[in-house]
Amino acid sequence: QRQMCIRDRGLVDKAIGQFRVNANLDLNFRLWKDTVNFYARGYVSNTLPSFYMRHYHSNHYNWDNDNMDKEFRTRVEGELNISRWGTNLRAGVENIKNYTYFNQSALPEQNGGNIQVLSATLKQDFRLGIFHLDNEVTWQKTSNETVLPLPQLSLYHNFYILAKLAKKVLTVQLGADVRYFTKYNAPAYAPGVQQFHLQPTDDLVEIGGYPIVNVYANLHLKRTRIFAMIYHVNAGMGSANSFLVPHYPINPRLFKIGVSWNFYD
């Protein structure tokens, strides 16, 4: 199956010539006794930064950036999916010219050159009887870590037991999951503009390199669902410098419980 979509958004002045072209290709083929799904996607876009990036006025921040150029983006990616194996692999490359971002002063700025971003994500699920292990690994590489910082590696693993009890009326799920990403100089948050921006060079905070572990239990009985979770169960067991965003620490250990009951009309 092949698809192509072209959108022209140009109107007047600098908006003339805006466009976005999408292309998709879907293929299914046999591999031994399994069906493999292959997807190829790509797009080319040439668009002005958002109105918010070009014009903003408030008590603390003001800007009018009428001279901003269009962002030119090109991306190509491929995806391979084998459902029977629980395997999904996706990889892509993107080139961005005139990348628009919020600088160290939380003001919009454009990078006049080209930035390339390579990325690959592998999802692999394993099952042995009632035991399940879901995994997701993402690798990223940016050609300009100063303007577009990214964690090079992000991990998610979820190990759980899934079983049906009481004559298969009660579904029970017990497990633990962990999230982790490598250290990098993540964007800081500016409440005044409600946006993430590059960290000031004199106040860099490197975040990452710290796992967040949760344990949980889910019960499903007819129309009733009950869940319980201990979030960040490993709080206080490792580095005290644990942040999701610079200067915003991760929430401490937290217990959550909830009930969902569906009523019929």
Where would I find each of the regions flagged by the language model?
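Exposed, low-structure sequence patches enriched in small/polar residues
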Residues: 1-265
